[in-house]
Amino acid sequence: MQILKENASNQRFVTRESEVNRICCGFNGFQLGERLRRDMKTSSITTLVVNTTTYFFKDTTELIDFKEKRIDLYEYARYGNPTTMALEEKISVLEGAESTLVMASGMYASNVMLLALVPTNGHIVATKDCYKETRIFMENFLTKLGITVTFIDSDDIAGLQTLVNNHEVSLFFTESPTNPFLRCVDIKLVSKICHRRGTLVCIDATIATPINQKTLALGADLVHHSATKYIGGHNDFLAGSISGSMELVSKIRNLHKLLGGTLNPNAAYLLIRGMKTMHLRVRQQNSTGMKMAQVLEAHPKVSRVYYLGLPSHPEHLIAKRQMTGIGGLISFEIDGDLKTTIKFIDALKIPYLAASFGGCESLVDQLATGIWDIPREERLKDGFQDNLVRFSFGIEDFEDIKADVLQALETI
């Protein structure tokens, strides 16, 4: 009698009555149950979540074949997981990349990339308005390894050219667009400048998304995402990704295995789920962002709007060349002081007062209060005026959001 019907598409092993009797000798039924239906394949249309820390080999021969790289299998969860690998393949297709590595957060992804690719005593060039924690990591930690970092303005092309010509620069790193002022670099141009001298280019395209910008096709060597944001799109997990050539991503993967910032397979599943609707979400956010930028720029109680879709933005023409949409993140300055801006923020009804961006829900924050722990003089030096607002538009109805913003402006 066959205990499990033999079906090659559904399971790897078939357990017969004689095998059950053999397994049962000296074991109770619980242990027998644990051995049945392991490694079962299904016809599910959704990617399976594989929650396991380790993987078994059917015999020692298979184990040795794996160790000697004759077959490709899984061994331990920190080194790989079927759910996570499916996610990596999907992101690679989106980015046009040879390989992708997904990790526990965007912050971890950028840090391990820098550690893997910049040698001791190497030199990094980065833009001044890169993510605050990334800058802290560069200035306070990488310098302990003898790595020097030069920060330049995002539009300082001449400065970049001088640095790569006169120094052995290992890597150029920038966000494009940046947060919160939505500055962008000409990716084709900076890649051309850097590649002449053998300098790698990594672009954090979190705000751009793989939908609105094909970063690798524009010439960058690597594209980084905080997948927590637009790719996941639901504000319910942390994740980061690096995509690029097999050679570069493999170097990052090797260090990642040592550092251990592994993405949980449940989070990988949520990210795969989010990717199914990303193009729809981003399309809605592109539309809402563009229309709200125009509404805000025309409003007498708004003194300035930062949005690449507007001709008033200094990098508007660059964005038009390399992006197919601008997204749902806008920064703007209220015509008033700190208290006036707080009054506007607190009068809003739809968005949550929260950090982050890119999810289904609209989020708003006043940058001065979001970085309240930084002295005001330092905030002002970096352009964070007391009246600066960052608004991440979600997928709510445009007319509802517009009405809410306008009524809040009427209160000041």
From Swiss-Prot:
Q: Where is the signal peptide?
A: none
Q: Which residues carry this modification: N6-(pyridoxal phosphate)lysine?
A: 229
Which note does the record give on the cofactor? Binds 1 pyridoxal 5'-phosphate per subunit.
Q: Write down the SUPFAM superfamilies for this protein, in alphabetical order.
A: PLP-dependent transferases (SSF53383)
The GO biological-process annotations, alphabetized, read as: methionine biosynthetic process; transsulfuration
What is the role of the protein in this entry? Catalyzes the first committed step of methionine (Met) biosynthesis. Catalyzes the formation of L-cystathionine from homoserine esters and L-cysteine, via a gamma-replacement reaction.
Family statement drawn from the similarity comment of this UniProt entry: Belongs to the trans-sulfuration enzymes family.
Name this protein carries in UniProt = Probable cystathionine gamma-synthase 2
Source organism of the structure: Arabidopsis thaliana
Instruction: List the top taxonomic levels of the source.
Output: Eukaryota, Viridiplantae, Streptophyta, Embryophyta, Tracheophyta
Q: What is the name of the gene encoding this protein?
A: CGS2
